[in-house]
């Protein structure tokens, strides 16, 4: 753990906090992974402690999969154009996740992994509304992305689409070149997205139960 003396300027800006965050960002690439104002979600010293110790923390995990992405790449008129469409969509994914307090784990080649750190078990319902907003936003914009792929394809498959799978539970934050997550919820979300139809979202049992309870209220 890094010890830094408290240092705040007259305007109230915490130089200490900013310096600590900058050091941590350099270590694990937070500019790629963290949402804006991530320090409000988890203090920098707590994030560093979790990465160093390997202690588990409660996390919601969302895995997205672009159906038929390998086929789309193979049938592309221009590989460069395919890469540009995918890159632009991944930027939209990161930006939308950040606006909904989600962390970008990685681009998987045919999809992505996003997560929300809720912490202790009693806070497990936290971020459900943000996850729903994120999912709705992506499913709303993906038809436009599909049209971009279609205009660049010599043979566009009918079952192209975006599928989402969501699981929740204890994960470990690790530094493998930069910040990554590992744990059963990653596996669970991956299994659910594999079963989801194009433009379908599959949730784990606990999240599905909370959603049903909200509908009944």
Residue ranges, per PLM feature:
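Extended catalytic cores and adjacent scaffolds of nucleotide/polyanion-binding enzymes
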Residues: 182-183, 187, 201, 205
């Amino acid at each position: 753990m890094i010890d830094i003396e408290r240092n705040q300027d007259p305007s109230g800006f915490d130089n200490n906090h900013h310096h600590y965050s900058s050091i941590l960002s350099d270590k694990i690439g937070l500019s790629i992974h963290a949402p804006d104002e991530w320090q409000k979600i988890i203090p920098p010293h707590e994030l560093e402690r979790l990465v160093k110790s390997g202690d588990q923390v409660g996390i919601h995990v969302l895995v997205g999969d672009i159906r038929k992405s390998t086929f789309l790449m193979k049938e592309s008129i221009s590989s460069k154009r395919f890469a540009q469409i995918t890159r632009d969509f991944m930027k939209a994914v990161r930006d939308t996740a950040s606006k909904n307090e989600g962390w970008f784990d990685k681009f998987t080649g045919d999809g992505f992994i996003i997560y929300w750190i809720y912490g202790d078990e009693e806070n497990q319902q936290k971020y459900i509304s943000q996850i729903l907003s994120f999912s709705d936003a992506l499913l709303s914009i993906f038809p436009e992305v599909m049209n971009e792929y279609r205009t660049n394809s010599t043979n566009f498959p009918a079952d192209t689409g975006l599928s989402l799978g969501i699981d929740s539970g204890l994960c470990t934050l690790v530094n493998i070149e930069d910040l990554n997550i590992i744990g059963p919820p990653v596996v669970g979300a991956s299994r659910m997205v594999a079963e989801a139809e194009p433009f379908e979202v599959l949730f784990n049992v606990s999240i599905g139960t909370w959603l049903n309870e909200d509908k009944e209220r």
